[in-house]
Amino acid sequence: MGGKTSESETVVQRFTELLDEQDYGKAADLTSYPAAASATMKQMFEGLQSGTVDYEASQVIDLDKQSAIFSMEVAWNFGEKKDWTYTLQGTVRKLAIGWRISWEPAVVMPQLTDNRTVKLVRTTAKPPPKVVDLPGEALMTEQTLNVIKIDPSRTGDLVGTTNALADAIEPVAPLITGPSLMQQLAGSQGQPIVAVNLRDGDFAILEPRMAKVPGVVMEKQPKLISADRRTRSPMLDALRKVWQDSLDATAGWGVQIFEADGRFVSQVAGYQGPSGPDIAATMDQRLQRAAEDAVVSAGTPATVVAIQPSTGAVVAVAQNSYATEKGPIAFTGLFPAGGTMELFRTVAAATKNKPPQDVTVQEAAEAATALGVGVDFKVAGLDEVTGRISAPGRSTEQVRQGAGADAVQVSPFGMAIAAAAISRGSVVPPMIVAGNPGTTDTPVPALPQPAIDRLRAMMNDGINKPETAALRGFRDVTAFAATGGADGWLLATMGDLVFAVHIADVDSGDATSRLAAVLLKSLATPEP
């Protein structure tokens, strides 16, 4: 602008400096309407709070002694490759109190008005990727869910509200009761709670009854859920994390303008690239449903984990409601190894070239890693533990030295990996996404061939024992059944499929085999 700085230039320069500092209060004082300017600029900086900005006066032209026009170049940065630039024009006038910027919201940002707001948002590619199963069918898709909440501030009778809502949703959510909702509210510190999420079909039927209940709030939210409501598994939560990671990796950004009532006006800046590829999950939904049929036949916590030993693909993970109350115990539950210690003892005997009866508890525990138990696998999206062993010098997955079988605690996931190692002849890294096997920093010793031969013989012999009689009607099945305290274990193989069964508080020695028989029968039965 050169030459002697005029009063109009001085005001514009000071205005840009204060905007750069995001000092909206002092910047507003340089306008003709400080209250409105302060409110607008406060919202702008809060809505774009992660950004930095540079306002630069590019030109100020005096029209006469009382007014001037100016231009500003504005550059926002919201992170790497997230830049937005624009040019603004405005007027500055000499008032009784001095030179002031003639206020209008568009003097700081295009398309702003007194009633509009601006916000920096994260954007996602459309359509989002879906999760497909092993055969390539849709496993999980993003759908609009109807989120049913209870807002305690909107009802004077919480007991009446919770009981009425529980009655209304009972046809689709029989486990949600008035007392269980009251328990949720007791821990919510007066905040609304989510009672249930409903698919559109269920919502359409139940909405009239729910709408009459005081304190019930109904909202629509997108969520990744199973394409088939029959498919339920803790593995879905892990796949949801993988899907979210994909969304994060392809996320874009946008500066968006909204009306006072929240209606979207336009996006004035931003970029959104293409969506990521579909997530290729390893789950086989037909096998998963068979596993679900099996676990619900048990009256105590029961889990099934099935793996394809040729690839390490986790093809099914099922828990009954009793198990789910305790969390994703198929992956993270730890239980005494019990009689399955004989498998580890067999490995130790072959490795150390000594009779099994001479193998110590400590040696058997240390041999568990050769079957993948006690190995810390890092599997995308999955929180898991294979087991905890009392091995000196091993800083992870340790417990105090126990007596006998208590020296090793195992998870159903870990025992499925052990079954896969017996079938394959070596530990195979597990995976829940095709082509993305787990990794580990834990040294995994090779299985000696004599150990492999003996372990397979134990599985072949096991199918002829009384406790596995329920499985003898199925072709090519081998099995090893054992108990650990009051719990039952079963490791089974059938061709390129292995699975581990765990049941807490078994009622008989053949409980795990009977559950496995339900699985195999369901798998052999054509679906309608």
PLM features per residue range, with description:
Residues 2, 14, 30, 34, ...:
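Second-shell loop/turn segments in exported
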Residues 1-17:
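Short, low-complexity N-terminal intrinsically disordered segments enriched in polar/charged residues
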Residues 9-10, 24-71:
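Short solvent-exposed beta->alpha transition segments
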Residues 70-79, 479-484:
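Short beta-strand segments that buttress and anchor functional surface loops
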Residues 71-73, 100-104, 119-125, 129, ...:
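Small/polar-residue-rich segments within soluble enzyme cores
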Residues 108-125, 139-150, 155-159, 253-354, ...:
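Short pre-catalytic segments that frame enzyme active sites
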Residues 266, 300-334, 347-507, 511, ...:
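Beta-lactam-recognizing serine transpeptidase/beta-lactamase-like catalytic domain environment
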Residues 81-121:
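Short beta-strand edge/turn micro-motifs at domain boundaries
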